[in-house]
UniProtKB/Swiss-Prot annotation:
Record function comment: This multifunctional protein catalyzes the formation, breakage and rearrangement of disulfide bonds. At the cell surface, seems to act as a reductase that cleaves disulfide bonds of proteins attached to the cell. May therefore cause structural modifications of exofacial proteins. Inside the cell, seems to form/rearrange disulfide bonds of nascent proteins. At high concentrations and following phosphorylation by FAM20C, functions as a chaperone that inhibits aggregation of misfolded proteins. At low concentrations, facilitates aggregation (anti-chaperone activity).
Lineage: Eukaryota, Metazoa, Chordata, Craniata, Vertebrata
Spans annotated as Disordered: 473-510
Protein name: Protein disulfide-isomerase
Modified residues (Phosphoserine): 333, 359, 429
Gene this chain is encoded by: P4HB
Length: 510
């Protein structure tokens, strides 16, 4: 600690001694290996983004990150924001376990042994609120109306506990809830003027927000669990737009059933269609999260593909559950009235809607090449043929590993094209789905031996022609592995830092 204090004094008193003082870009410190340690010593609290110049997520984060840095600097905060180009500073990236972009870590008191991973949203308010929670009290004491008003205005969502006795059991429960939430500012007050300002004549908790009804008053027994449920239920808008910034809130939230309206902002009656969607949302608050996506936006095209949609098919509605297995649902009607959307959601909650499985049309020449082409419509017939041993690659067109495997898979097809009972096949899993098979990574290789038992064997051996041949000649034994082994192998091999933006977007967002 003494060494750190002396170094801070030296930096402050004699900038010339700081041989490689970091530059600033929009209030964000630009760090390199040569000045990283000194920056940690000079700043008690330092949030560092490890980024890549080509990363789409990093580009989207940049203005919000700079906005947060400027806000904290203007407040005279001890917290500073910094960034490291991990493609240039590979030693730093390796030291701090950077495997994907952006990776954001929080350093306190120069501690490099265990920096905290940043886990909140990607809007400026989220960043500022998370940092203040990490460096200050769980709830700010509000001595007067001006302080309360300042807190409410500081963020899209804020929570204030009104307690005449701030040492009461209810107040303690409130503070425990405040400690559990990183991305929302909390305040606590016992001041009678603040009670009057917000029309309270007894103890209570109020969530203030700059959308929808503006505020929600907590009702019920004040416990940590009840307060957390209340906040999670009310903190998001009835309808939220999907963007790079809102994605962490959407996918990291407690509500795992999402209904999506793919709505181009250029469409006629845009406001009317969005209004219908919002009207339907009122009946499902806390049960289904209503999200709308600008289907014309370039960044959202991969999501359309994931749902098997084309731009010209929008506006459209789809529903997805984000439990252990993602399952999609499609309304029977294309009408986007509030009544139709409400009916669809009710039927889903009642278990009356079957999952929607995508399938491309079957190509006329699907079986004319050594590697047979499977789609959703012919998968069952081919893969589970009782008289055939079928080896299938489940791939994604954008997957780098799949592209590397393609020529080997084609050679495998050539090897067995005239075999009486071995079939080599492939299926684009971004455009085709089958109920019996869940694909978690690309490429996934599965073997369907000739059998009446619908047996499925995962391949986890070498991705070489010889490895595949040994596997097939052994009847699916040499190289077999369970699905968990396959996922671990993919994760171990996956060069996260070299993924193209689209691939990472699908993984992160879906």
């Amino acid at each position: 600690m003494l060494r750190r204090a002396l170094l801070c004094l030296a930096v402050a008193a004699a900038p010339g001694l700081y041989a490689d003082a970091p530059e600033e870009e929009d209030h964000v410190l630009v760090l390199r290996k040569s000045n990283f340690a000194e920056a940690l010593a000079a700043h008690k609290y330092l949030l560092v983004e490890f980024y890549a110049p080509w990363c789409g997520h990093c580009k989207a984060l940049a203005p919000e990150y700079a906005k947060a840095a400027g806000k904290l600097k203007a407040e005279g905060s001890e917290i500073r924001l910094a960034k490291v180009d991990a493609t240039e500073e590979s030693d730093l990236a390796q030291q701090y376990g950077v495997r994907g972009y952006p990776t954001i870590k929080f350093f306190r008191n120069g501690d490099t042994a265990s920096p905290k991973e940043y886990t909140a949203g990607r809007e400026a308010d989220d960043i500022v609120n998370w940092l203040k929670k990490r460096t200050g009290p769980a709830a700010t004491t509000l001595p007067d109306g001006a302080a309360a008003e300042s807190l409410v205005e500081s963020s899209e969502v804020a929570v204030i506990g009104f307690f005449k006795d701030v040492e009461s059991d209810s107040a303690k429960q409130f503070l425990q809830a405040a400690e559990a939430i990183d991305d929302i500012p909390f305040g606590i007050t016992s001041n009678s003027d603040v009670f009057s300002k917000y029309q309270l004549d007894k103890d209570g908790v109020v969530l203030f927000k700059k959308f929808d009804e503006g505020r929600n008053n907590f009702e019920g027994e004040v416990t940590k669990e009840n307060l957390l449920d209340f906040i999670k239920y009310n903190q998001l808008p009835l309808v939220i737009e999907f963007t790079e910034q809102t994605a962490p809130k959407i996918f990291g939230g407690e509500i795992k059933t999402h209904i999506l309206l793919f709505l181009p902002k250029s469409v006629s009656d845009y406001d009317g269609k969005l209004s219908n969607f919002k009207t339907a949302a009122e009946s499902f608050k806390g049960k289904i999260l209503f999200i709308f996506i600008d289907s014309d936006h370039t960044d959202n095209q991969r999501i359309l593909e994931f749902f098997g949609l084309k731009k010209e098919e929008c506006p459209a509605v789809r529903l997805i559950t984000l439990e252990e297995e993602m399952t999609k649902y499609k309304p029977e009607s294309d009408e986007l009235t509030a009544e139709r959307i409400t009916e669809f959601c009710h039927r889903f909650l009642e278990g009356k809607i079957k999952p929607h499985l995508m399938s491309q049309e079957l190509p006329e020449d699907w079986d004319k090449q050594p590697v047979k082409v499977l789609v959703g419509k012919n998968f069952e017939e081919v893969a589970f043929d009782e008289n055939k041993n079928v080896f299938v690659e489940f791939y994604a067109p954008w997957c780098g590993h799949c592209k590397q495997l393609a020529p080997i898979w084609d050679k495998l097809g050539e090897t067995y094209k005239d075999h009486e009972n071995i079939v080599i096949a492939k299926m684009d899993s971004t455009a085709n789905e089958v109920e019996a098979i869940k694909v978690h990574s690309f490429p996934t290789l599965k073997f369907f031996p000739a059998s009446v038992d619908r047996t499925v064997i995962d391949y986890n051996g070498e991705r070489t022609l010889d490895g595949f041949k040994k596997f097939l000649e052994s009847g699916g034994q040499d190289g077999a592995g369970d699905d968990d082994d396959l996922e671990d192998l993919e994760e171990a091999e996956e060069p996260d830092m070299e993924e193209d933006d689209d691939q990472k977007a699908v993984k992160d967002e879906l």
